[in-house]
Amino acid sequence: MDSISKYDNKCAIHKEHKIKMICATCKDVVCNECILLDHNGHKFGRIDVENSKEIFEEFKNNHLQNLDKQIGINNELLNESNNLFKSLEDKHTENVNTITEVFKELPKLLPIIEIDKIKQLVTLYDENKDINTNISTIVHDYSNNINLITNKYKNTINQINIDQIINDNNSYQHIEILKHCCQSRLLIKDNQNENKINELMDQYKNVNFVNNSEQVKESIKEIFEISNSLSITNVKDPKRVIAGGKECFIYKNDSIIPNGTTHLAIAPSVKTIKIGSIPTSVKYLVLLDGFNVQLKEGMLPQSITHLFVGAIKKPLLKGSIPNGVTDLSLLDGFNQKITEIPQSTVHLYLFDTPLTNFPFQNFILRTSKYKQQFAHPKVKDWNLSTWEPKIEL
């Protein structure tokens, strides 16, 4: 191996181009493509003893020992990703099995629809699988880069005489060392790797699976509805909620609701609700998207008259809706089973929900967002745009 090919002098980003200069703004080695694309407008300098020594000392004293820590962080993120993907995979299997069982009872025409619905599920599953694969690849690549650098220098770093290498005009070894110095900084700089993995994890999609088999006589092609949304782990607490014409106090996990509060929104970060924790002054209550507590009788006070329910993650069981509620609004994305609506409820408001079967005999008011067809003796179309809660994330 000749002295030219012995050392890696290629750009870590633009791998076909050789490192030419140092960006004085970023203190990074750059190739011609870097100068044109990624460092446009920056100041550049020739590679010399002074700037080389500065970069090397930073690598030697700060970056090298932190590279192993980065592998641990990456592996933790990978484990979190794998666990999340496993739950999505299990749900995928459950959904496919449900579709298969229902379609076994239907005539020969229905397997065509079955294939289409499963294809939708598989497409979403493949997207989640691709995300998981991408995260695994990123962690693997970063780990390889880290191992390459640590294995090369961890036992020799104190024996490297950068001054001698530079003075001996061994430019290829010199530039390789500079490259690894700068590359190590990028591997741990500003948590870029963690941010990239978290951004990919935010793209995981839950499958919103609604079984409408009881309505097969009305619309056989709508037995199952398949859509997707970001995983529940990605649902964020809002900054501001307005409902019933007034700003709500946002109840977050472990927060205390002030006495006298009349308008309340419960954030998705809330893990438990103790009976008596919500004051009886509350009249308007919003259950926000991602709310994941199984409501039981007594958790919500009887003082609530107006209940707004978003895309929550648990069904509304018997007794979970307070008997004082007069107006119940099912907001965009609500797709949970409702076991019972209390007799106190006078109006049921429907926004963009896929449900068509409600245990309710009083007036149903549906917005233009509601696209489902269903028979009910007291249903009316209504403009409820001013009634819909305003949520600022």
From Swiss-Prot:
GO MF assignments: zinc ion binding
UniProt xrefs under Pfam families: FNIP, zf-B_box
SUPFAM superfamilies hit by this protein: B-box zinc-binding domain
Residues noted as binding Zn(2+) in the record, renumbered to the chain: C11, H14, C34, H39
Residues in B box-type zinc fingers: 6-47
Name of the featured protein: Uncharacterized protein DDB_G0279899
SMART domains hit by this protein: BBOX (SM00336)
Organism: Dictyostelium discoideum (Social amoeba)
